[in-house]
Amino acid sequence: RELDGVVINEKTKLEETEIPVKTFQPTHVNRNHELFLDSLKLAKLGGTIDLTCEDFPHGLIEDGKDPVIGLLEEARRAGVPMERMTLSSDGQGSWSNYDEYGNLVEMGVTDVGNMYAQLRSLVLNGGFVLSEALSFFTSNPAKALELFPKKGCIAPGADADLLLMGEALALDTVIARGRVMMEAG
């Protein structure tokens, strides 16, 4: 089977090449479960895999059935280091749905708020500790993209990209590169 062009099986192309496994960073691996399971193999070899944040049209998923939470838990049970997992969205990217005949039935734009809503869901619905939930959006992708420690952490010399949150993780202030971009929610 192929994982975004990388064959994953008993004898992978990764084992036959000098290309470092960290070079491969497949995204949207939760678009189907078979792809997700194959991607776990890549993560165990040292690659980083990315799940797409869920669409939260009304804030949190009310019934608590957030599929990303289940997939992260499945990856943990499979022995995947959580440092090998990232979460992202196609914020402001277009999406489309087709019927069984390939006809376009719906199209739209992904909400940039999905990542923040996903963070809240991980903590409030999934029981993730805030520091671990944040790592899927901050330090993990920064390390995978070799931007750490300039990005993905709070440290001297880092860019000072911060979210200040209140109760129930209500967003209060956004700081980017040390400049306040939004204040008082």
Please place each PLM-identified region on the residue numbering.
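Internal amphipathic alpha-helical segments of the cytochrome P450 catalytic fold
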Residues: 23, 130, 151, 171-172
